[in-house]
Amino acid sequence: PAVYHALTREDLESRLAKTGGTPYRCASVKTALGGDVQLPASAINAMRRDVLAQLTAQRGRVKPARLHPYNALAPYDGMTGEPQLTVSVRSASQITARMLALRPTVLYVPLAEILANPDLPGRLGVETQLAAVLPRVTWSGEDRQLAAQLREVYALGVRQLLVGNLGQLKIAKAAGFAVRGDFGLNIYNSRSMQYLRAQGVDSQLLSFELTLPQIRDISKAVPSEVLVYGRLPLMLMENCVIKNRTGTCACDAGVTKLVDRMGEEFPIVKDGGSCRNV
């Protein structure tokens, strides 16, 4: 005659935990058995397979897309008249009399360079606005130092900042500066331009990847700038490759270069007053 054994907690948990050949792993099993329960192993296995099949079916369901009404963008016409010249320099030594004679509308200078040359604001004509360029990356641990530098440059008469990431918008506004957007914001479409307008940004350098027709058609919710001459920054590195290579801080000793297998040279410079490399 057949011999029946009562189902034990250990037997039940062992069979339910068998998920081999499936993408699942059983982390734990909770059981509640009362009395002498008898259940064939085949029934337990079938129950486990059914549960896993239901789980797979739930995972395969596609959530319906959330649709929102399309809101047409408000039209903004671009500036009329001749384009205005804005100039960005890496060091104060690049600010020559010949360059100032061009009467740029805005001159962008790294924050650290302005602090190192406090006479710079007084050297510019009334037709040229001076904007301090913030480092593209600032860690939260640098906030106190940055705040002190902003107070110092504000005392020198600087009232505009060029910011390269969205996190700096709040910092700049809180410090009382007008804000201009740098290429790091990667503005590529009209909705982004209108967002910047809502955030109080005064101008925006458009993405390098835009074509001339795209530049023409993008919303002019804020005055737009395009880079027409100069080197394009390829990447930003947290660690100073110059110091790691030479063992000394030599950013100001000359231009360091990377050379690829085709012989192309890529200058490496520091990002503002930081030890990060561009």
Please give the residue ranges for each predicted region.
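Active-site pocket-lining/capping segments in soluble small-molecule metabolic enzymes
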Residues: 1-278
